[in-house]
Amino acid sequence: MTVSSAPGKVYLFGEHAVVYGEPAVPCAIERRARVTVERRDDDRVRVNADDLSLDGFTVAWGGEGDDAPELDVPTNLLEAAMGYIDGAVAQARDAADAPDAGLDITVESDIPLGAGLGSSAAVVVAGIDAATRELGAAIADEALAERAFQVEHEVQDGQASPADTFCSTMGGAVRVQGEDRRRIDDVGSLPFVVGYDGGAGDTGELVAGVRDLRDRHVFAADTVEAIGDLVREGETLLRGEDTPLDELGGLMNFNHGLLSALGVSARSLDSMVWAARESGAYGAKLTGAGGGGCIVALDDSEGSKTALDYTPGCEEAFRAELDTDGVRRES
């Protein structure tokens, strides 16, 4: 039996713009997905996922004559949850040169699904790592991140960025711009507060919407480039000896405004952003694809957390420190 875990993430800056070659800075947070894998004697795959904010399910498939898993859950749940796990299994089998290996897989996560916190990336990273090691092969972090990205890229119909999977694999604050992917070293404390509206945006649709806007309007393309310029300034601040939280927060506020202009915010997200700002946060913005899900605030006091607890439409609020660990080989 082999266990791996990987962290979720928030975007400090740069979501959506990263799809077009601009830099982004995602940061790993101390909420994780854990995947336990045990090899079977046959070629079937059995997945138990009873802690994915989805009511839980168990599914088994594989073997001659089985074209798809059978389970008593809605089709969209099957597609959302199983697409990533199925891709992780395929990547692990390929990495270990074990195309017919059967696996028992248990998935646990304290990262809300579809909320902009990198839940799918964390599950895929931890899943590939645990399954590959259970099948007797080793995998380097860089190769793991690339394989995990290939899974997300396929499941999201080519709309995915490598930022989520790279951040989940490496941990800490990272910079991603095309093929240039690296950790930002010696980043100080980043006191994040996350607000969650209980919803989930459709990443593929939101990314496609920004693409359409960018293709039709010069000002939208300029907005994407402005996000890239903002990220570069933020990265410079992160690399300093004393991280100026007030300046970082100001850039987060600006970034949220640009994302709103691109049409990816939502009323619930804006309400949480303003609640955090008015309670004294250095800055706040949506994180991830948008359309619903989460916001992230930068606040070293209890103000934002308390304000979000009482904000209509905010189902959960929690503190989330920067997690300097990426994938963990737990057993």
Question: Where do the language-model regions lie?
Answer:
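Glycine- and acidic-rich phosphate- and metal-coordinating loops
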Residues: 89-112
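Short pre-catalytic strand/loop immediately N-terminal to key active-site residues, enriched for Gly-Thr
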Residues: 108-115, 282-284
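Contiguous, small/hydrophobic- and glycine-enriched helical/loop subdomains that border
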Residues: 100-103, 133-154
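Short alpha-helical patches at coil-to-helix transitions and adjacent helical residues
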Residues: 9, 82-85, 121-128, 167
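DPxDG-like acidic metal-binding loop motif
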Residues: 28-31, 115-141
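C-terminal nucleotide
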Residues: 3, 7, 34-79, 83, ...
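FAD-binding core of FAD-dependent oxidoreductases
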Residues: 17-21, 26-30, 118-122, 160-171, ...
